[in-house]
């Protein structure tokens, strides 16, 4: 195996000493980059891009050519798993993802099962291909959606503003939702382990919609199943630990509970104060975040000020991976993203060493 030239990201996740705070950006391979748009046009559709090993590799590497990032993240989509379960994923123009066969009837839910991972071979092929293309530059992150977040799309049949269908099921037929969530948890565990086998050096679980739940519901219908996944993941590969990051958008209320599920790091959205979060979780986990994606729409000076504030809030020592508090917006200026990355590297050195 090719040795890593830059393992700062992996060391920070394990709270080991680093020279500076590493940074990557959620959705760093995406529509804000003109080169991404060109490759996407070549692919035909978003799903074709995900399923084309060569092009998925190309778009994963693109942001690394432009910015001095400390990690690459697999280019894929969280909905590959329910698609492999036979729900018929498609993307309606201007409407986002939809499923032809939403899970709204007991008979359909009874038939739901963990998909054969061979149906997701295109994802694992992409992981292997990206690792080869990276040639040890930086680590590669694999990822999946959380069981609850996947269930939101599977039950609603697409995105939703109020999640009425899944919440109705949760309160009126919790047994049905638990069946979906348990199947999802088993599928995600197998999926992430296969990504690790293919070469992913860290993995992130995205719980995009857990934050819409009440306190009790989050613990019962989201966190419980994320814990189940974390317990089933391979944590060693190629002779080193494979760190696990859990990111729950709107999850600031539950940091203490999330810190106890066995993950190595928690991702924070932009609404949390990272210094306060560090005090709340203590030494249990590293923290990732949490620059407001829309702060990239400010001036170069305001971007630098915001970076300085987040670094100062976190304070001295390792255990911080700088990131956005959510995915980068498609209208963000790539030049501003470069200012962000370079400023993090420049200003963070004072908080490390010595």
Swiss-Prot record:
Involved pathway(s): Porphyrin-containing compound metabolism; protoporphyrin-IX biosynthesis; coproporphyrinogen-III from 5-aminolevulinate: step 4/4
Binding site for substrate: 27-31, 46, 77, 153, 208, 326
BP GO terms, sorted: heme biosynthetic process; protoporphyrinogen IX biosynthetic process from glutamate
Gene Ontology molecular function terms on file: uroporphyrinogen decarboxylase activity
EC number: 4.1.1.37
GO cellular component: cytosol
UniProt subcellular location: Cytoplasm
Signal sequence interval, chain numbering: none
Cited InterPro entries: UROD/MetE-like_sf, Uroporphyrinogen_deCO2ase_HemE, Uroporphyrinogen_deCOase
Keyword Cell membrane: no
Protein name in the entry: Uroporphyrinogen decarboxylase
Species this chain originates from: Neisseria meningitidis serogroup B (strain ATCC BAA-335 / MC58)
Encoding gene, per UniProt annotation: hemE
């Amino acid at each position: 195996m090719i040795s890593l030239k830059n393992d700062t990201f992996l060391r920070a996740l394990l709270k080991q000493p680093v020279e500076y705070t590493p940074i990557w950006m959620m959705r760093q391979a995406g529509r804000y980059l003109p080169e991404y748009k060109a490759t996407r046009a070549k692919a035909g559709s978003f799903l074709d891009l995900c399923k084309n090993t060569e092009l998925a590799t190309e778009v994963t590497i693109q942001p690394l050519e432009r910015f001095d990032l400390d990690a690459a993240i697999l280019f894929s989509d969280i909905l590959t798993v329910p698609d492999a379960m036979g729900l018929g994923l498609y993307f309606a123009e201007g409407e986002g993802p939809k499923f032809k066969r939403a899970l709204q009837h007991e008979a359909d839910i009874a038939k739901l099962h963990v998909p054969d991972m061979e149906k997701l071979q295109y994802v694992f092929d992409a992981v292997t291909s990206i690792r080869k293309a990276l040639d040890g530059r930086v680590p590669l992150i694999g990822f999946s959606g959380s069981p609850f977040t996947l269930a939101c799309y599977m039950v609603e049949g697409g995105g939703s503003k109020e999640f009425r269908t899944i919440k109705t099921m949760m309160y009126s037929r919790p047994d049905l939702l638990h069946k979906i969530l348990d199947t999802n948890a088993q599928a995600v565990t197998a999926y992430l382990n296969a990504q690790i086998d293919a070469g992913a050096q860290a993995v992130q679980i995205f719980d995009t919609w857990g934050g819409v739940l009440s306190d009790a519901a989050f613990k019962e219908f989201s966190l419980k199943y994320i814990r189940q996944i974390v317990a089933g993941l391979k944590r060693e590969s190629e002779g080193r630990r494979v760190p696990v990051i859990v990111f729950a958008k709107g999850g600031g209320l539950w940091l203490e509970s999330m810190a106890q599920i066995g993950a190595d790091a928690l991702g924070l959205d932009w609404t949390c104060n990272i210094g306060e979060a560090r005090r709340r979780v203590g030494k249990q986990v590293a923290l990732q975040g949490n620059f407001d994606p829309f702060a990239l729409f400010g001036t170069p000076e305001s971007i630098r000020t915001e970076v300085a504030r987040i670094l100062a809030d976190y304070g001295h020592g390792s255990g911080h991976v700088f990131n956005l508090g959510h995915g980068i917006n498609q209208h963000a200026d790539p030049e501003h993203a470069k200012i962000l990355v370079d400023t993090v590297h420049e200003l963070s050195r004072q908080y490390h060493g010595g």
